[in-house]
Structures are given as structure tokens and as C-alpha cells.
Amino acid sequence: MAHDLNCLTIAELEVLATERMDKQTRDYYNEGADGGSTVRENMSAYKKYRLRPRVLRNVSKVDSSVEVLGARNSVPFGVAPAAMQKLAHPDGELATARACKSKGIVMGLSSFSTTTLEDVRTASGNIPNILQLYLFENRQHSSKLIQRAKQAGYKAVVLTVDTPLLGRRNLEIRNQFHLPSHLKIANFADEDDIYASTWAGPRPSSAAFYEGDHRVLPAGPITFHSHGANPTLSWEEAIPWLKQEASPMQVWLKGIVTGEDAQLAVAHNVDGIIVSNHGGRQLDGTLATLDALPEIVAAVDRRIPVHIDGGIRHGADIFKALALGADFCWIGRPVLWGLAYDGQAGIELCLRLLSDEFRLCMGLMGVTKVSDISREYLCRMKRDGLLSRL
């Protein structure tokens, strides 16, 4: 396939996408919490590692495929769930699903998508889908969504566990971020219609609060800012409830950054975890996901799969994450940049760039199978500039 000479790297894709997004959308997708240090460190963590290639190996046939969620994925990465994709392009999540289908890559869908989970599932064909999930304080809303995902054929629900409260994103506050009136949170449109029939003018949403000792639940149309946070969740109650409710779908947790929580995830019989800090959008100063990965891999000890997201901007980053013990990677912002740049074709470009870079990295490293990637192919750059073997 011919190269897009305007865009040969993910960095160039970001620049091109920035030119096509309005300020509110650009800031919403790209901003991190507070000063944004975790967003930057998610990326810079990969620069701490150097590659140790092996030579004089036959790499004429390189197989980059892996099995994930019971299907063969063309590369060891998927498209991470990201909310409200019609902000970037009118086709939104449908463009993402079609691009994933064309490239043989698994897609995650946000609960707060601007396309229904059923329409995304149809557009995905035989490519597996996962549904990112929040457990709302009004559990009925979550239960409805889980049942719809089950009926539509989703392979797993992925519970976001790092949002007991919402991180502070200053540009969202300054821009007074809101979804444009022509768009809606599609998976909760029925609930929206209920409020539309009882209110004249704008439909209000309110977050939960306490009246004395009584907790008043979120009200109004379901939005991330009013309903996404849930400070009442606990290991003892939420995980058993979700496993029972979601069966036979798998239950994964996204937002684990410590070995202690990884061990609790194993103890509570979840099917897998995603090492994630919400793209640096929740708690600024959190461990970069790549820095957290080795501790979590050791704690899990191969009892369940360990995936990772955050900061990946090149195929070699994927190689490094796998070498440190990740089983699979998820790509977020670069896919949104592809969507903003050129819809489905832009996402396909993003996925092709990362896939080509990863396969080239495999070959130049002397590796022909993903399962052969290990720590022996990395060394770490120390603060004094010296390299140390892992």
C-alpha cells in the first residue's frame, strides 16, 4: 500500500489531527489532569529502555499475530475505548469499528459512545468487541447496558476502576466542555428521552451528593461528569456482582497500577487486567503505566492476562511493553487523531503505521514470533546515562 506522504509517523498524525479539531474537542482528547505530568511520563517512560537486537537469525517470515478474547488478532494491540468519537468525525465509532474490521484488530467501546453498542457490534463483523463499563450508583443503568452487550455478542466488559472521583481537567473547566446539541450519548438515549418528556428547555444532570447522612443519587440524563464517578464501589461488593451480572462475558478491570491491587484482582477471579492510569486524565503524578507494569506482572505471575495502555506512540513501544511482560497493548489517543484526520481511512493509517513499525522492530530484533519477545531484548537507561541489563 502506498504511503501517505503527509503522514509517516504518529507524531505527524497528531499535528494533522490538531488542525482539524475545534479547540474544545482537541483539549478534551489531549488534556491530562492538572499539570499533565502523567500524560508526558506515560510517553517518556518508554525512552528509559533501549533495545538489544540479535542478528544472523532467519527473519524472512515474521508472525505478529496473537490470540485475544478467543480470536486471532493481526498484531498484539487493540483500539482502546474512548468516549464521544463523533466529536472528532461525523462517523465516530462506526469509522473506528470499520477500520478495526479491515485490519483484523479488536476494538473497545466506551459506555459514553456517540454510537450505540449494537451498531458498533454490527459494523465490527467477526472482530471481537469489549465494552468499557462504569458501575453507576444507580446499578439499574449499568445492568441494562450489560444485558445489551451480552445480547449483542460482546466478549467482555472492562470495568474502569480509577474513577471514584473525577480528576481535575482544567481546560475542560475553562472551555465549559459540553456535548454539542446535535450529538448524544447513544447508549443512554432512552433515559435521555424520559427526561426530555418531563423538562422544557435544557435537560439538567446532577452528580450524587449527601443531604446529612442520606446520599442522593445522580439524576437527569446520564453523562460522564454527572454519573461516571462512583466513590461507593468496593472489591467485596462490586466485583462479585459484576461477575454474576455479566456472565458468560469475561470481566476485566482497567485502572490497576499497583501489585497489591493486581493481587486483589486475581483473588476476586477477574479474567484480566489493564494497567492504566486513564491516559493521565485522573490523578496527576500517578505512576506511568510502563513503570507500573513490571511490579504488576510479577504480582500476577501469569495467572491472568496483563494488558497495558498509555503513552504508546510507536511500534517499538509495543515491543518494549511486551518485553516487560504485557500480553497485549491498547492504543487510545493516536486512534482519535487518525479519526479526526480522515475518518475510517485515518484510523486505518494509524493502525498501519503502528503495525508496520512493530513488525519491522520484530524483524530487526531477530524475533519471528510474539511469544519469543522477552526481557532479554531490553536494557534500561539509568540516571547516570549507563545501561543495565534487566
Task: Write out the residue ranges for each language-model feature.
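Alpha/beta catalytic cores of nucleotide-metabolism and tRNA/nucleoside-modifying enzymes
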Residues: 1-47, 291-390
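A gly/proline- and charged-residue-enriched helix-loop-helix capping module
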Residues: 102-123, 127-142
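Glycine-rich active-site/cofactor-binding loop and its immediate structural neighborhood
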Residues: 73-115
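Short beta->alpha linker loops
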Residues: 33-34, 111-115, 137, 257, ...
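An N-cap/entry alpha-helix motif that binds or orients negatively charged groups
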Residues: 1-71, 169, 176-234, 372-373, ...
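Short catalytic-loop micro-motif centered on adjacent basic/acidic residues
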Residues: 29, 107-109, 129-133, 251-253, ...
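Alpha/beta enzyme core
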Residues: 84, 98, 102, 122-123, ...
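Short, conserved beta-strand segments within well-ordered enzyme catalytic domains
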Residues: 50, 65-67, 76-80, 106-110, ...
